[in-house]
């Protein structure tokens, strides 16, 4: 009897809840930290990015229309599913060069839980009832911005990714994520978790590929309302900021901090990608 040939995973894109190959048919080789080849990942094109933005926009009304409590439950479910696949994430973190992969997996799961807990507390803690000199009620409430582009950090391919995606979607935004070019397999594994969770298709869209090729198109896309440039390389930051200014995108860059530091998680990372609306209402006689 011949020896069984194991089934190799093909690292595809994640767009609209599905796993398509790049429309260009391109892929690029991914290497382990020791230089050994690991896999081939799909190399997303400009058209793939456009498709991801369309999927994110289509998913926005349903996701933003859910109650904050329900969104928190959905994020908690993601943490539950990651817990069940922790050995896979641990092995992939080790391949990516993590010195303590168990710590990295624990921190990523805990970050989902932390932001899930904030889902139904943002409006109460950061929204306000404003005193005004007149017969009016005046309220300020947070609302999601819309479609958010995210450039994931290169060196923290799991915790860094979760730390950018979780605060963006818990507030009701939908996202188009450029995964770490160097270690994209962890992003693909996270996409597989999201696909089997309660996160609606299109809320998180993950593209693997060449960062320098995709960032300009993400930053300049007119239907992207905000962009998190935390993972943009220094040499691309000025051009990214200029491209984002064309449609007055909200541009956010997380503070420089160790992602394992509790200070790296903050409710202000949620509101950085939200808008605050002030409403006036007459009191009546």
PLM region descriptions:
Residues 166, 226-230:
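Periplasmic-binding protein-like
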Residues 34-123:
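Glycine-rich loop-to-alpha-helix module at the N-terminal edge of alpha/beta enzyme cores
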Residues 166-169, 217, 243:
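Hydrophobic/aromatic ligand-binding patch that stacks against planar heteroaromatic rings
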Residues 136, 213-214:
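Short acidic active-site motifs
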Residues 1-41, 73, 77, 107-113, ...:
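Terminal low-complexity tails and localization/encapsulation signals of metabolic enzymes
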Residues 35, 71, 172, 204, ...:
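Residue-level signal for inorganic ion chemistry
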Residues 206-209:
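Active-site donor-binding acidic/aromatic loop of nucleotide-activated sugar
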Residues 117-200:
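Conserved small-residue-rich beta-alpha loop and adjacent elements
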């Amino acid at each position: 009897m011949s020896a069984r040939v194991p089934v190799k995973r093909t690292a595809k894109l994640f767009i609209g809840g599905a796993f398509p190959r790049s429309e260009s048919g391109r892929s690029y080789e991914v290497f382990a930290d020791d230089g050994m080849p690991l896999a081939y990942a799909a190399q997303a094109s400009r058209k793939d990015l456009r498709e991801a933005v369309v999927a994110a926009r289509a998913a926005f009304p349903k996701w933003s229309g859910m109650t904050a409590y329900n969104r928190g439950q959905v994020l908690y479910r993601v943490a539950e599913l990651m817990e069940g696949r922790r050995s896979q994430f641990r092995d992939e973190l080790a391949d990516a060069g993590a010195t303590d992969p168990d710590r990295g997996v624990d921190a990523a799961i805990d970050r989902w839980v932390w932001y899930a807990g904030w889902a139904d507390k943002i409006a109460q803690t950061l929204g306000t009832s404003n005193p005004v000199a007149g017969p009016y009620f005046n309220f300020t409430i947070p609302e999601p911005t819309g479609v958010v582009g995210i450039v994931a950090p290169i060196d923290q391919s799991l915790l860094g990714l979760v730390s950018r995606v979780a605060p963006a979607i818990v507030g009701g935004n939908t996202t188009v994520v450029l995964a770490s070019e160097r270690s994209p397999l962890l992003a693909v594994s996270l996409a597989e978790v999201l696909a089997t969770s309660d996160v609606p298709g299109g809320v998180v869209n993950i593209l693997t590929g060449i960062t320098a090729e995709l960032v300009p198109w993400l930053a300049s896309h007119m239907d992207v309302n905000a962009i998190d440039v935390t993972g943009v390389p220094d040499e691309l930051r000025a051009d990214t900021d200029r491209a984002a200014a064309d449609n007055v995108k909200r541009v956010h860059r997380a503070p420089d901090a160790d992602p394992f530091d509790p200070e790296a998680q903050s409710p202000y990372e949620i509101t950085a990608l939200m808008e605050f609306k002030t409403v006036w209402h007459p009191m009546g006689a």
